[in-house]
Amino acid sequence: MRTTRWMLIVLALFLVSGMALAQGGDTSALKPPKGYKVAIVVFEDLQCPDCARAEPLLKEAEKTYKIPLVRHDFPLPQHNWSFEAHILARYFDSKSKDMGEEWRHFVFTNQNSFTKDNLRGIAERFAAEHKTNVPFAIDPTGQFKNLVQADFQLGQRVGVQHTPTIYIVSNSQRSAPVVEVVDRTQMFQQIDQIIKQAGGTTESASAAPIKKPTRKPPIKKDAQ
């Protein structure tokens, strides 16, 4: 199975690159989207419990500061349904970016209800609620897998060793371009400081509006 092979490759890369990652990575590729001075960047795993705990804070920061939340796929090899959930996220992205964002938020909100066996069924119900469907083969050409792999490889170059890894990024020359959020209780203070250093504003006239995900009721776990 392709997914199993990919997970084995990921595990091997973790083992081989561990020493290099411990020495830090290249964060130069992490920048705010066009039109924004400041953004939040997160490398996350949809099956990671700590990522689910961080999700409300990230969404609150996005709403409070009106800055983009840029998500990167970083499915860990020890999680048995995460990779497929990220593939589904990319599939929903292909329908609309808002739908992909809603799927990720939905997964984190209902993470404890997911299993490897019921993932597809939940995704099909989510799709139906959004007036679309999940085809039998959602990634026949491998394009979504390639996007997930590209994000994972970016995370390795950056030096990601755990999920979530959160950065505040800025294009201001008066502040550090990338600041890692080590203590999430300090994240808002870090954002305040970086926005102040960026001149007190977070976006330019060309910035795209940030949309909030549609809230969905909690799901019930499929009967085993």
Task: Kindly give the residue locations of the regions a language model identified.
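A short beta-strand-turn-helix
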Residues: 23-38
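C-terminal cap of thioredoxin/glutaredoxin-like
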Residues: 124-224
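Extracellular/periplasmic catalytic domains that process cell-envelope and extracellular macromolecules
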Residues: 32-35, 62-64, 81, 157-162
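Residue-level detector of short, conserved catalytic/binding motifs and their immediate flanks
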Residues: 38, 67, 164
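A generic local structural motif
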Residues: 25-29, 55-57, 151-154
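Structural alpha/beta surface segment adjacent to cysteine/selenocysteine redox centers
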Residues: 41, 46, 52-128
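Bacterial N-terminal signal peptides
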Residues: 8-18
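Bacterial N-terminal signal peptides that target proteins for export
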Residues: 1-9
